[in-house]
Amino acid sequence: MAKKQSILSPIIRITFTFLVLCGLVYPLIVTGIAQAVMKDNADGSLIYNDKNEVIGSTLIGQNFTDPRYFHGRVSSIEYKAEASGSNNYAPSNPDLEKRVEKSIEEWKKQNPSVPVTEVPIDLVTNSGSGLDPDISPKAASVQVERISKLTNIPKETLDQLIKDQTEGAALGLFGETRVNVLKLNLELQKIMK
């Protein structure tokens, strides 16, 4: 019996020690460093309106359906963050072809003056997560004519807005040149007021 206690005692102490270290100390240290070094990112990169209410995050896309605003990528989960993911069909899957054709038809209805051959692929295909907040600058630019027509904002103003909201690759290496749709639409909304 004494031998069992002598074996169990160090096991219990080690388990408790690692439980405290890995479950409490390490997360607190990492959270403290994140809050000190990159507070905005650690808090979810939230965007607030004039009333200091959270209206979104720069990291999660939103579904913009009003034709006066820029639209983001197609989302098979309708931008519901709790259901992140996508039907990642193989290029040979007929369902992918149907989904893309449906996206192109919707595009043509809203943007009849833009030839389908000029529509960037990111506007008619899903992302892996279904939550992409960004589109390519070209994807934003092909929407300028529609938005200009509906809002009476000059195309040049919209082009400059896109240019101002365009972000380069992170550290000059990671990712693509992109435009955050939520931030772009918030700036557009300021012009429309």
UniProtKB/Swiss-Prot annotation:
Pfam assignment, any one: KdpC
Keywords for this protein: ATP-binding, Cell membrane, Ion transport, Membrane, Nucleotide-binding, Potassium, Potassium transport, Transmembrane, Transmembrane helix, Transport
Keyword S-adenosyl-L-methionine: no
The keyword Transmembrane appears for this protein: yes
Major place of residence: membrane
Gene Ontology cellular component annotations, sorted alphabetically: plasma membrane
GO molecular function, one term: P-type potassium transmembrane transporter activity
Source species, domain of life: Bacteria
Topological type in the membrane: Single-pass membrane protein
Transmembrane segments: 14-34
Location of this chain's protein in the cell: Cell membrane
Family affiliation: Belongs to the KdpC family.
Function: Part of the high-affinity ATP-driven potassium transport (or Kdp) system, which catalyzes the hydrolysis of ATP coupled with the electrogenic transport of potassium into the cytoplasm. This subunit acts as a catalytic chaperone that increases the ATP-binding affinity of the ATP-hydrolyzing subunit KdpB by the formation of a transient KdpB/KdpC/ATP ternary complex.
Subunit text: The system is composed of three essential subunits: KdpA, KdpB and KdpC.
Descriptive protein name: Potassium-transporting ATPase KdpC subunit
Source lineage: Bacteria, Bacillati, Bacillota, Bacilli, Bacillales
